[in-house]
Swiss-Prot record:
Pathway it works in: Cofactor biosynthesis; adenosylcobalamin biosynthesis; cob(II)yrinate a,c-diamide from sirohydrochlorin (anaerobic route): step 6/10
Coiled-coil intervals: none
Catalytic reactions on record: Co-precorrin-5B + S-adenosyl-L-methionine = Co-precorrin-6A + S-adenosyl-L-homocysteine
InterPro entries, sorted: CbiD, CbiD_sf
Protein name in UniProt: Cobalt-precorrin-5B C(1)-methyltransferase
A UniProt-annotated Pfam family: CbiD
Organism: Nitratidesulfovibrio vulgaris (strain ATCC 29579 / DSM 644 / CCUG 34227 / NCIMB 8303 / VKM B-1760 / Hildenborough)
Record family assignment: Belongs to the CbiD family.
EC number: 2.1.1.195
Region (Disordered): 1-25
Taxonomic superkingdom: Bacteria
Length: 389
């Protein structure tokens, strides 16, 4: 899977990139392949060219080796072209993310290989134009190294050794991966915040891209939290998307951007992952709809799987002293935003919002586990903070 670092991020309170668009069946979505698989296929194509083998428009390449699995699975990957370049060759693959909202979809991945006959069975991996380099701790790649994750590295090594062995070649190979538009693409990802500079990352735990993968989102949330903790931060500020994060940043102006993580709908996972990494204090910023769902105790808040319980919200409003006519209107509202508009003029509005926020806080601290305090910040779409607890 690719990481969320290469995905579009949710704007808040809508249908973000964690779920397919309305009317699209997840099972019918087309899978793609990762940047790691693109790099590997390019390397295989280039090696074949160097060894004098014929060009194949589709190559069967190994997927990343998995623990406990002896022989990796394989995938057919289209190859755009192979070019002789210097004393080696370059294989070109156009990244295909399938139906996933992936910033790297359509990117030209160029993998240059050069044989090193005097370097016995050595694979040297380098990053060229458009491939990032790691500058912050907490990532699975060491500081100073090219941003190619362990999965793609193992995938590349397996494939290179496979081709070389078939040709009876026991020397070394230098592999340089390039993404000509990588630096521009990276501006639409979270790489800058993660301290990956100069381009995109080469990613892929499985080698294939599952559209709107929850696992990819969770892996990226965990990665961002790991970077923040490795930098020594004790507070993490989690939000549901871009707008709530921007408002949360204004609320905590002394914290660097690495302390802020967009968790989308994965509230329980994100809070638990933050607690596991040793954060002492957490903040959660959201708008009213996500707040109500958290107050309901829902661990995942996307509309497709987590319905808003407006009759329950109405009951909470009644308990807070909201006028009965407004309570009934809240129960029959179409959206959380409409319910908030109904409550706002009432004298008991602030009491009601405080009560809902306290319920959300209780569930957030349950998700985080004992000993971790969570502060909830409720924002209005106009940018004001309505309450906190």
């Amino acid at each position: 899977m690719e990481s969320r670092a290469d995905h579009a991020v949710p704007a808040d309170e809508g249908h973000g990139a964690t779920e397919p668009p309305r009317g699209r069946d997840r099972a019918a979505l087309r899978e793609g392949f990762t940047t790691g698989t693109a790099m590997t296929a390019g390397a295989v194509a280039a090696l074949r060219h160097v060894f004098g083998l014929p060009f194949l428009p589709v190559l069967s390449v190994p997927l990343p080796p998995q623990e406990g699995v002896g022989v990796p699975g394989r995938l057919g990957v289209p190859v755009a072209e192979v070019l002789t370049e210097g004393d080696g060759a370059t294989g070109v693959v156009i990244k295909d993310g399938g139906d996933d909202p992936d910033a790297t979809h359509g990117a030209r991945i160029e993998t240059h290989v050069r044989l090193l006959p005097d370097a016995t069975a050595t694979l040297l991996l380098e990053g060229g134009t458009g491939v990032g380099r790691v500058t912050l701790p907490g990532l699975p790649v060491a500081v100073g190294e090219v941003a190619v994750n362990p999965g793609p590295r193992a995938q590349l090594e397996f494939a290179v050794r496979e081709v070389c062995a078939a040709q009876g070649y026991g020397g070394g190979v230098r592999v340089t991966v390039r993404v000509p538009e990588g630096e521009a693409i990276a501006r639409h990802t979270l790489n800058g915040r993660l301290g990956i500079v100069g381009g995109i990352s080469i990613l892929g735990t499985r080698g294939t891209v599952r559209p709107y993968s929850h696992e990819a989102w969770k892996a990226a949330i965990a990665q961002e939290l790991s970077v923040a903790r490795a930098l020594g931060h004790r507070r993490a500020c989690l939000s549901t998307g871009r707008r709530s994060e921007t408002l949360l940043m204004r609320r905590y102006p002394d914290l660097p951007e690495q302390a802020f993580v967009q968790a989308a709908d994965f509230v329980a996972f994100a809070l638990g992952a933050a607690a596991e990494r040793g954060f002492e204090a957490l903040a959660w910023g959201c708008f009213f709809g996500k707040l109500v769902k958290l107050a309901q105790g829902l661990p995942h808040t996307h509309a497709r799987t987590a319905p808003l319980d407006l009759p329950l919200l109405a009951q909470w409003c009644r308990e807070a002293g909201v006028d009965e006519a407004r309570v009934e209107a809240v129960a029959g509202a179409n959206t959380a935003g409409q319910a908030l508009d109904i409550i706002t003029p009432d004298a008991a509005c602030h009491t009601a919002l405080d009560a809902v926020t306290r319920r959300a806080k209780a569930h957030a601290e349950r998700f985080a586990g004992p000993g971790v305090g969570v502060t909830i910040h409720l924002f209005h779409l106009n940018g004001t903070e309505l309450t906190s607890a």
